[in-house]
A protein has these predicted regions:
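Terminal appendage regions of diverse proteins
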Residues: 28, 122-182
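Short coil/turn segments at secondary-structure boundaries
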Residues: 32-35, 73-79, 176
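Generic, well-ordered alpha-helical scaffold segments in large soluble proteins
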Residues: 16-24, 58-69, 108, 144, ...
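Non-catalytic interaction/regulatory segments
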Residues: 45-134
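Gly/Ser/Thr-rich beta-alpha loop segments that engage phosphate groups in nucleotides
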Residues: 28, 35, 108-110, 115-116, ...
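Active/ligand-binding-proximal structured segments within catalytic/core domains
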Residues: 1-45, 138
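A generic structural motif
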Residues: 2-4, 47-51, 132, 145-149
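Ordered, soluble secondary-structure elements with a strong preference for glycine-centered loop motifs
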Residues: 6-12, 49-57, 150-154, 168, ...
């Protein structure tokens, strides 16, 4: 049950990140592939340039704003033409029948037959852990959600505390301690 919930969190978070990427980078962003498991999510997308640190922060902020708003996540069935006419995003190369499932998570509306949480708040916090190139005009973003985000933050806190001890400072004035040692 814990593993399945983690997968549902990461799968729904993938849709929300796709929406956030399009809001920050532009409508040219299209999904090129993804991987979802209980540990993380990976999302490949079309984009012509590296995503800056500021853009990544805005993407995270938008995604987490949507998760924290605790919007209902709905899955409905309709004809493919009706879904597309209402603005649902379909993925190039995917084969769809005449009837499709439409996933709605706030402003994110996509064709998807996968498993999801029932409200965006069930995802928890989404944290982007990497972004990079995987080919010409193709980027990859990796992220975690839910308890994996908590685990990551706790791990980061331990590393910060260890480095602070090494440089003789507290975690809150770590940069000062590092600058003294450099």
């Amino acid at each position: 049950a814990v593993r399945r919930l983690a997968i549902r969190r990461h799968h729904t978070a993938t849709h929300i990140l796709h929406w956030s990427l399009r809001q920050v980078l532009g409508d040219h962003v299209k999904q090129a592939g993804s991987l979802v498991d209980d540990e993380r999510l990976r999302f490949d997308f079309s984009h012509y340039d590296a995503v800056s640190e500021d853009e990544l922060l805005r993407i995270e902020e938008l995604a987490n704003s949507l998760t924290l708003s605790n919007e209902r996540v709905d899955s409905t069935e309709s004809s493919k033409d009706e879904a597309l006419a209402k603005g649902a995003i379909a993925f190039f190369g995917d084969k769809y029948g005449d009837r499709v499932r439409v996933l709605s998570a706030g402003p994110s509306v996509e064709l998807c037959g996968g498993t999801h949480v029932s409200a965006t708040g069930d995802i928890g916090i989404i944290k982007v852990i990497s972004e990079g190139s995987v080919g010409a005009n193709l980027r990859r973003i990796e992220a975690v959600a839910g308890t994996r985000t908590l685990n990551l933050l706790q791990q980061d806190r331990r590393v910060i505390a260890d480095v602070a001890r090494l440089v003789g400072s507290g975690p809150d004035d770590l940069m000062i301690g590092v600058q003294r040692k450099v």
